[in-house]
Amino acid sequence: GCYVTPGFVDIHTHYDGQATWSNRMSPSSHHGVTSVVMGNCGVGFAPVRPTDHDLLIELMEGVEDIPGVALNEGLSWDWESFPDYMDYLAKRQFDMDIGAQIPHAALRVYVMGQRGADREPATAEDIAQMRQLTVEAMAAGALGFTSSRTLNHRTSRGEPTPTLQAEVDELLGMASALKTAGRGVMEMISDFEDLDG
């Protein structure tokens, strides 16, 4: 028999790149999904500096097994900030509704540069800047903030994610940004309380 159902909402997708070059969010749109949320697992493509394009592609390829060659060919990088990315998406039309979250890895590398990629501890100034950019992302329409502290998430080169060793004060700083925004979700994948523990 057949079923009549409302549209399904897929709260965990990685269409962050595909949404910049395709109006079809397939295969989800082929299966009755009418809304998707992307920016999960702390990986995504904004905010980004031109020098960090390859790193963000390596993260998405490694964490989500999305071919780097497709991302390299498809991403136009016509944005830098997360609000710019949201504006870019807003100019496009899709076969379903999409929502984006601000990814911690991109945010951390944007603010801290190589120190962030190398998993060095964030300073109070770094945290304040990440917090402010998260507030701005929420004002631009982000649904929330995502992070990952799991050893299973690695770049395509096998390196741990920039967020693996993010400390509690850094994560609390991002949570306080959501409080300031007055809304949003915080999604985090974590295998441990402390890396050494």
Feature annotation, model-predicted:
Residues 1, 102, 106, 149-151:
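Short, small-residue-rich loop/turn micro-motifs
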Residues 13-15, 75, 123, 164:
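A generic secondary-structure micro-motif detector
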Residues 3-27:
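Di-metal (Zn2+ and/or Mg2+/Mn2+) metal-binding site signature of metallo-dependent hydrolases
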Residues 83-94, 119-197:
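Histidine/acidic residue-rich metal-binding segments in metalloenzymes
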Residues 16, 43-47, 106-109, 152-157, ...:
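Flexible loop/turn segments at secondary-structure boundaries
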Residues 21-144:
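Divalent-metal coordination cores built from histidine and acidic residues
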Residues 2-6, 111-114, 151-155:
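A short alpha-helix capping/helix-coil boundary motif
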Residues 8-10, 71, 117-119, 159-160:
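A short, structure-level motif marking secondary-structure boundaries and short turns
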